[in-house]
Amino acid sequence: TIDTMEIHIDHYKVASPKGRVILFHGVGGNGRMLSALALPLMRNGFEVICPDLPLYGYTRCSKNVTWQTWVSVGTEIVNHYQSTKQLPTFLFGLSAGGMLAYQTATECPQLNGLMASCILDQRNKEVTKHSAKNPYVGMAAKPALALLQRVAGRVRIPMKWIGNMKAIVNNEELAAVLMKDKKSSGARVSLAFIHTMLNPVIKTEPEDFKSCPFLLVHPAEDHWTDLKFSLLFYQRLACEKHTVILEGAGHFPIEEPGLMQQACAAFLESHL
């Protein structure tokens, strides 16, 4: 329980873990959807933590959730598990979880490494324009939400009305199934959450981030968030950084034959 929220966590345990990996989903997922990465990492000897972030999965919350709530929850989770047992700890973020992992890392300087499938700085208008459902929604979203959230911040709408959710996977049938799932891509989120996600308060700019190495594992066929938009932020990072391109993979990389898992495992082993 964090600040009255009952956070559901899928916990992959091993007898003598060599390290700990905390996986963050994005605005179209939940903890279970990260099992394709969690299970191989567990088999490689890592303890893996997959939370359902507020508004998604089985997590229960009655409070008004903002993007900062996610950052606070991520930080609390890192601190909680570090307080129970000190282990080399890494964060991984899928989709919007990439920026969440980065912002959490700025609050938790003791981390060994940071991994993300993309890292989008929504303060950049071009990023918002091209990650929205369509460019027109992207251009209108920020000014409209700035007004609406003041009077109707708690009102919830389907995230798929704003985000280009149909591009979460490069498989139309699977995308349709996911968008019907109220615990993942079909979730309803508050206007306040969307507004704060598009206007994040980033504590440490990338030029000043030096606390741990960063691995960008970006799908080559991502039809939602093109690599060039992640590079706008990634190339500014002052820390040690590495890039792996997942050939043939979509935004949620269901196609690639273990390339993400292999890249992450190699990164983890080299930074224990």
Segments (PLM) and residue ranges:
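Alpha/beta-hydrolase-fold enzymes
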Residues: 100-186
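The serine-hydrolase catalytic nucleophile loop
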Residues: 27-39
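Short beta-strand/loop motif that positions the catalytic acidic residue
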Residues: 210, 216-218, 222
